[in-house]
Amino acid sequence: MTILANIEIRPTGPDNEFRAAQLLYTTAMPMFEFLYGPDRDFMFNMLAWQWQAEESLFSHRLALGAYDCDGHLIGLELGCDNRAEAAAFAGTHAVIRARATAEQQAHLSRSAPQLTYLTPHTPDGNYCVHNLAVDPHAGVKGLGRRLLRGAFEHAAKADYRAVCLDVLDNIQPLVSICTWAWIWPARCACPA
């Protein structure tokens, strides 16, 4: 078992794209499956391509990674402020135009607008954690909390007023981390 003290927490690069895609998928499985449709290869490739992009919603440039002693990516925190979100959305659209087939683009143009309520506006002066993932098989107790602490440290250095957490509430480890960090969830009821 790897202990937390042996984990390196640092900014990520464009490598480890397929591992990053797997970790990102765990943060919002139903959303990604709806967004990208039944073609799982396409879904994971899109997440990997966005990870490699300099600008996208899932760009490595927005992430802090957790690496084991062998250099494997075993966790990540990905977030930004509202100024970076506009460029990230534009970057994601560029990846879609460059990589998706016409049929895949048509599917995304139908599915993506239905998910806008899942991406709340980040208030000015705030940093928003959009994705927080840890490989449960890595067996590193406290890694999610350490990544979240990294987000708070980043926010403090950059003089953000607050840190927002944009996560789905059906992921129990995240609910536990939020309780640990004294983060109280805001509930939103969406019309049927």
Segments predicted by a language model, with ranges:
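A short beta-loop-alpha structural element at the N-terminal edge
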Residues: E8-Q22, M31-F34, N82
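Conserved GNAT-fold acetyl-CoA-binding loop/helix
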Residues: A28-W51, T92, I96-T101
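Active-site rim helix/loop that mediates acceptor-substrate recognition in acyltransferases
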Residues: R40-A63, D68-C69, T116-L118
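Conserved acyl-donor/pantetheine-binding loop and adjacent beta-alpha core of acyl/acetyltransferases
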Residues: R83-N126
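Conserved acetyl-CoA-binding loop-helix of GNAT-fold acetyltransferases
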Residues: V140-E153, C178-T179
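Conserved catalytic-core motifs of GNAT/GCN5-like acyltransferases
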Residues: C164-D166, C178, I183-A192
